[in-house]
């Protein structure tokens, strides 16, 4: 059951909480000024889930959970500029909590074009026993899309390890008119899975973005990595295997 324990452990690694973080700033709900959509109010939103969580890979290919630790996180980007991300590492060094305040893309009359695309580069340092390596096989994202006709929104993520050129990417595009919460489960193609180096700790990089385009310059849209409070929830699932060399 070690593999199941590892998956449960790292599935929480980037989970979001709304509790104050001791020693850091106190995050809170931020009200977002939505564009003026026809009707004057935001209609009821549905929830979309793209796929179910994949099964545990099983077997004895995972390291002891007590020897897997998140030792540091760095970040940067227009969606997470300095000072806009709260983070805390649990006492057992097993859980990383991140809360983003400015991960929102907007488009429409009077909106600066710089607001059409937001991105965030995350670097997550993991320490784990030698003889093992891991890969990201899926990630969950939760957000909100309100797009008028003529507006398209894209959420994309790229995963890679420091010092390696191989990448795994996932992407989803919505076309307006649409108004809904979304829950995405991105599962990497098995043929393009990227593994951390053997015999070395893995620095996992996640470069994510939300982007809006429009064929009608009068159309409006907003795309976030969570609903109106704009807190961003991301859960990363990993697969372990023993090194073969």
UniProtKB/Swiss-Prot annotation:
Record: glycosylation sites: 189, 225
Cross-referenced Pfam families: DUF4360 (PF14273)
Signal peptide: 1-18
Subcellular location as annotated: Secreted
GO cellular component terms, semicolon-separated: extracellular region
Positions of region (Disordered): 21-66
Keywords: Glycoprotein, Secreted, Signal
Family annotation (InterPro entries): DUF4360
Record's protein name: Uncharacterized secreted protein ARB_07590
């Amino acid at each position: 059951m070690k593999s199941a324990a590892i998956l449960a452990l790292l599935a929480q690694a980037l989970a979001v909480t709304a509790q104050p973080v001791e020693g850091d700033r106190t995050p809170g709900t931020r009200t977002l000024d939505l564009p003026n959509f026809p009707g004057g109010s935001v209609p009821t939103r549905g929830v979309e889930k793209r796929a179910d969580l994949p099964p545990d890979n099983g077997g004895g290919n995972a390291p002891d959970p007590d020897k897997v630790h998140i030792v540091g996180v760095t970040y940067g980007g227009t969606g997470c500029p300095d000072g806009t991300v709260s983070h805390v590492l649990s006492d057992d060094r097993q859980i990383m909590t991140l809360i983003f305040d400015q991960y929102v893309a907007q488009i429409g009359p009077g909106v600066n074009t710089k607001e059409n695309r937001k991105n965030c580069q995350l670097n997550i340092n993991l320490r784990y026993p030698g003889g093992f390596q891991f890969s990201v096989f899926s990630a969950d994202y939760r957000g909100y899309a309100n797009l008028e006709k003529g507006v398209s929104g894209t959420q994309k993520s790229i995963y890679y390890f420091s010092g390696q050129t191989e990448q795994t990417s996932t992407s989803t595009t919505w076309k307006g008119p649409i108004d809904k919460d979304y829950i995405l489960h991105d599962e990497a193609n098995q043929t393009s899975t990227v593994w951390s180096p053997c015999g070395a700790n893995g620095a996992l990089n996640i470069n994510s973005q939300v982007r809006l385009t429009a064929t009608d310059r009068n159309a409006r849209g907003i795309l976030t990595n969570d609903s109106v409070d704009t807190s961003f929830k991301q859960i990363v699932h990993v697969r372990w295997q023993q090194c073969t060399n």
